[in-house]
Swiss-Prot record:
Signal peptide: none annotated. Induction: By urea. Required for maturation of urease via the functional incorporation of the urease nickel metallocenter. It is found in: Cytoplasm. UreD, UreF and UreG form a complex that acts as a GTP-hydrolysis-dependent molecular chaperone, activating the urease apoprotein by helping to assemble the nickel containing metallocenter of UreC. The UreE protein probably delivers the nickel. This is Urease accessory protein UreD. Belongs to the UreD family. GO terms for cellular component: cytoplasm. Keywords: Chaperone, Cytoplasm, Nickel insertion. HAMAP family: UreD.
Amino acid sequence: MPDFSEKGWLADIALRYELKRGKTCLTEKRHLGPLMVQRPFYPEQGVAHTYLLHPPGGVVGGDTLSININVQPYAHALLTTPGATKFYRSAGGTASQTQTLTVAQEGFLEWLPQENIFFPDAQVCLTTHIHLASSAKFIGWEMQCFGRPVLNEWFETGKVKGRLNFYVDERLILTESMRVEGLQKQAAAMREFPMFGSLYIYPATDALKEIIQHHLEKVNPLVEYGLTDVDGILVLRVLGTQTEPMMACFAQVWQIVRQHWLGYCPEPPRIWAT
């Protein structure tokens, strides 16, 4: 794979969702550079499904991406991506992606991107800020794949740094950091799994945690997992060797949460099957 110069894309997108006559509408869309979205569609009544697109197909050293999602009171938006986000090798520059997700009172955001894939020699900095009103609902995940294990290509060199801050009513509830510098140095921490993921659910309840735990024990997914309640946020952490079992695990939990909160089980976005 060729090297890329340190001069990269500058991409910024800001989306605002509001409830209008019983339907969530994308009322504001601003974008700079190659980040963009398709028009929302409505496979479920009133819920705005949106695909977030990055046309060049991948991210290289020097690229700077900023994603801002704002869900207003009582609005309900679901965002996903049509495929994995690929972070390619760097010739020296760092690829940076910052995500800010904000949900107002009684709003509901489902942030369900497909996995990030970090190629060997990638230099990446990821930052996620989640700001929720206490009466909001949120389910979202991040899946990280280091190298391309299906091709026996491992992330032996490179650096990925990440930070997630989770606020409720502007109070910092949860902060997490990630630092991976080649899997040779990280093998003990990740137990030699090339993939890990985190799924966040707010608000947490004992009943919901019990339902999810029972499901995970029953289906015995092909992943290693742990489920914890962190000050009212349910966090499901997963280690795996392939994308499909991890995605299946998260998608099933997402359906369980939807059933518990809204009384019906949604169909997965069709784009996940392509």
